[in-house]
Amino acid sequence: NAVMLGYNTDVEKDGGVALGADSVASVDKDIAGYDPSTKLASANTSAAWKATHAAVSVGNGSTATRQITGVAAGTNDTDAVNVAQLKAIAGGTGSIHFVSVKGGNASSVNYNNDGAKETGAIAIGANAEATANSAVAMGFNAQSNGSGSIVIGESSGLIPDASKRGASKGNSSIIIGTENVDKGGTKEHAGSNDGILGSNNTIQESNGAFVTGAFNHVSDSYQFGQLSASEQQKLAQAMADGKPLGKYIGKWGSHVFVTGDGNTVSQGMNVTISGSQNTVKNSKSQTVIGDSNKITDRNAGTVSGKQEERTKNVSDLVIGKGNDISGNDTYMKGYESLTVIGNNNKAVNPSSSIVIGDNQRLSAIEESVVIGSMTPEEKADPDIQQKHASVVVGYHAQSGTGAGGGMNVALGHGAKAYGWQETVTGIKSIVEAGDSGYDGYLASVYGGLNTVASNKADQNDGMANTVVGTLNKTEGANGALVFGAGNSVTHSFGTAPTDENGKSMDEYWSDAILVGQKYAMGEGPLGHDELRKAMGLAMSTGGGSVVTMGNGNTSDYAVHSQIIGSGNILTGTANTPSINNTINGYANTGRNVERMSMMGTGNNMSGSTADVVIGDYHHKDGGKNNVILGSMATEKKTVEKTYTMKDASGNVILEKKYKVTENVPIKSHTANISNAVMLGYNTDVEKDGGVA
């Protein structure tokens, strides 16, 4: 059945046709044609792809070849294609401009346009590979291994290990940029719904994370909760209605959003970062804006077990640079949030507070408001910390110490409240703390440069002191009330009664007063009336309870006494304090006196008991139960005095003599007189019981 037409022709297969001189027909029937889509012989067995008869040859393929001319364009699948048809195809591809792919060598993946492995997949670029349904990989070394995922960029990829790939891993993620990698992970939906835009970013064992920038890293931030039947029904209805789906997919994805450079998120959930070099680890519901902030273990385990409740209800907010927040309140209630705005603040196990400022050290802070800044040196001092349930406003202002304290108000530049439940309002005013938890307890200071000092020896030092004014001081005193400027109350403690067993009642009252800490937080067994009663009894008996009102008054070793005026002095001794005295006026002095009432100017009483003095310039030593009304004769004298200035260490740095003109009494009263009455100008009694 062969046809051989022409000189030196030959047919080597049955039914072959050789046309023209030197033609050889050597191709048999049943030979499949070349499929350009696969670059292999076609697997199609139809007559259009597989010949039913041996081939027709017009040459021998080497020394004899011929053009077939005058061929019209074919119509059917088995018709020949002419050059006109090929030109038309070339013209169609030539209409695409500015598209060029320059790859490596023939061994590169996708060299043979085979990088797209699954249905609907697209791979463009040398070594580009799309191995999942509808995946897109575009760029040199681009890898897209998740269904419906898009990877665009050099050496970027959604590339979970082949052994870990699954139907849900890496799905619907988008990566755009250079050398970005989403490694997926072992979890069912790891790598799904992620987004990366930038360069050198990494996501691993996470889902629902979105990263923009460079050199960011997100890991172990994964959530895929199951919807309830009701939620699934609502979601389906919302999808059918074309409504937003956000509120139905809160259980899906980590909701981690990172914008910036060099940020790290590990074990995060509902985390938003904007900035550079920030770190969030084992912490959920965090918003971080700024640079070099570090938040760790905000979701550490707790005794209360409410850390996940906190995640649902609130979010921490950190704005600034260099802030370091670690740990949480082990007894949290589930609604605590921390707001830090500033730079280089450090908080360990914080709860719910608001901090605005720089270089603050916060120790287990809870329900506090801190506005102001410390220096780096102050931050480095472990004794300078802000404590819980406090309001602190001002540069260098402080509530509590490293050893304890808290629940204070400190308002003003350098205001310090070191103890418990203190109120300090004023520039550089301070309530010191001692060795006892009672020191400075419930003290109140209003004004600048006041000090409620602790001598570190007396328990209850500074308790319930009230200071209003400026440059006043109390030390070794409790229950003191100071109003004015330049006043001093020192060594002022009372003696509380004892119970039937000889135990001081002050212990019972102090224990009750301390319950005020719980009362302030809405807890504890005692109400306000019981606390008030205990405080009243403690201060009226065991308290020093010295009241000074005016300027430049001094009380030392005096209790249960009152000074009103200016320049007055009331003193006693450690063994026998002056007690139950009243001084009203100017420049009066009482030394070692008891139950004395003095009103006037320039009086000086020493060692007297139950004397009443009304008038000016009475000087008397000893005696008791005297009544003096009137003024003594005086003369003006120039008196030389010395002003000595000392530094904080007690060293004399200045000493100046100066002179003043004063009224000086011409004579003093007879000493050690008792039961006398002196009525009128310049009177005196020389015998007990006398009346002048």
Located regions from the model:
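Extracellular repetitive beta-rich solenoid segments
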Residues: 52, 62-89
